[in-house]
Amino acid sequence: RYEYDTRINRICGMCNLENYDTTYDYLFSSAGSGPGFATWKRVANLWDDTYSFLNNEYDMHKFQAKYNTLDDKRYHETCKAHQAEGKAHWETIYSYACQLNSQLVIIPTRNLVHNNGIGVANSTHSDLTLDQVLPQLRQLTYQPSYELSFPIKHPLFILEDVEYMQKRLHVMGRDSRTHRKYVKIKSLIWRIRH
């Protein structure tokens, strides 16, 4: 359905809210999670592994005016560091391609992914044990997964679900400066105790 629609960047399998109450089986968001996603070659063709977009002063000015939170500024600095080291990092080239092209991500309204990569011996992506993970994030990582039911109920319009994004940012502790600090302090205390 969206293979040739350049407004769509990828299809995610993970819903950070486990279940999100809406009329449809999926929604559109400006960001999604990495576990269990699919994309198309047309999206990979937008990736700039030399980070040359950082040298485009005019477009970077527009970009930074739109994405101007503290997290956005830190991510931009991370991107510059990746450019300086001369090594492409998938996360940054992928994210920037999506944002620079104003693309949206498809998110299922029920989580379809069961992630068992944290707290497992010889894990590929994490050396943390389960007791080192903040309970709030553990809940996010180990939430139940559900089967997709057919026929799929498609949204009528391609429009970002801003309410979903706000709830997602809250769950991740990134919705406000105060909440971000609270989550960081809680995480630090948790790690000291464990």
Which positions does each model-derived feature cover?
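Peripheral/terminal regions associated with large enzymatic or DNA-binding modules
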Residues: R1-H194
